[in-house]
Amino acid sequence: MLESIPPILRPESVEPVALKNFAEKFNLEVVGDPEGVLLTGISMNTGDLRPGDLFVAMPGKKTHGANFVAKALELGAVAIVTDQAGLDLIGVSQVPVLILENPRAHLGDLAAFVYGNVPGNLPKLFATTGTNGKTSTSYLLEGILRQLGEVTGLTSTAERHIAGEVIVSRLTTPESPEMQALIARMREKGVTSVAVEVSAQALSQLRVDGMHFDVVGFTNLSHDHLDDYEDMQEYLEAKLPLFTKKRADRGVVCLDTVYGKAFVKQSEIPVVTITSQMGVDADWHVGITAETPAYTSFVLAGPNGVNIRSRVPLLGAHMAANAGLAIVMLIEAGFSAERIQAAIQNGIEAYLPGRTERVTGATGPDVYVDFGHSPDAFLNTLAAVRKVTEGRVFMVFGADGDRDASKRPAMARVAAEGSDVLIITDHHPRFEDPASIRKALFDSAVEARPNLEIYEVSPPEAAIRKAVSMAKPGDAILWAGPGHQDYRDIRGVRTPYSARAEARAALKENGWA
């Protein structure tokens, strides 16, 4: 069974844009007659195209979008934007063709204009980037905004939120036509503040072009995505454009990794700094006051003696650091520390699907399902679990196929060093041999801790059952990798699958209800 793909979210009503005005706005050459042509949407993908759309035909990795113009016209496209190469492929067109070299570089601005997302007509926009913590920070930011009385929107790896409506996500950061349509839908629903999770890939592919954020935040940078970027320096440089005058007014940088200083040094916009580390010089400091399996209490200390106390409904000091970053971003946006303290004095109200999510029953071992899939994520989460666990710590994990393989040895090493019992299983093998992935992880784990109790169990539903069958009350199980995801990718087929549901079922089968 294939995973259903959520539809593109668009505003329910759009003020049509005259193609003639559109062409004049962007100074585009028009082949054909634009007179009387009205645009009600924009798409770069025929799978999302609707009647009245402007179809943007761009060169791709394998083929040119101009090869899909016939399909676009069948679906109701009323005009085409393409480059000279695309025009040559199209030949004689039934609809007007607008010539624009490098359409992708302008796609965000084109989409913003079509959907009426112009300065003075937008909600407050917040963006968070980093290797780990950007989803959590975005959810916490949205939660605090809601407690402050804002009507909120969210776009993240896990979900999209529009004034309380929840929709499954397709990408961490959607392509710019989808993003602009989403923002327009949020405006239509009265959203006043939006938290946006921004990946390095989104910045490299210009998906947030056409957007200008009130405040942007940086969480951290660690080993990941080196299948997309040559090295850590290139990965860093992919994220830096979020801290430019083109994209934001102000920034908040976490100094918990060495790359934070690079952001401060290279930022084009004013930034303030935050840390949860002792001995690090920063404007704001996060200190932990209590940790339990259900929540982490903290104090955020800042300039002029400001102290904000609250708790986050998640396990781990790293989650408190994410909450601190979210709070400082709000202060930089103009919300007063006093108002924020009053709103969150009894805790931050947010549900983060698959982020150290505790799926434990009333009895039995604590079981956490987490999305973390990098060495640094493993390190932080294992440390947090260890701190609140009296008994043994079990870890269940696998590695993504057809993704950055260079991080696998470090993932296995951290997993081995941080657990008492390690169970290696499958994650998304994609087109790789899952047995080969497991063997590589197993070998690295054994090398790190030769005497550790290590098992190789496939498929993952058997792996979690193995862990639960071995665990006792007082023990904890961390299943790292699947998090919120509701599928497994096996040879290009996304099969419905929920790690959280499997974990709950395993607990029930073992009498831990």
Feature-to-residue mapping (PLM):
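Residue-level signal for inorganic ion chemistry
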Residues: 22, 53, 72, 110, ...
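Phosphate-binding loop of NTP-binding sites
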Residues: 106-255, 261-268, 389, 511
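Acidic, Mg2+-coordinating active-site environments of NTP-dependent enzymes
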Residues: 23, 88-92, 213-367, 443-450, ...
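Well-ordered beta-strand positions
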Residues: 54, 79, 215, 250, ...
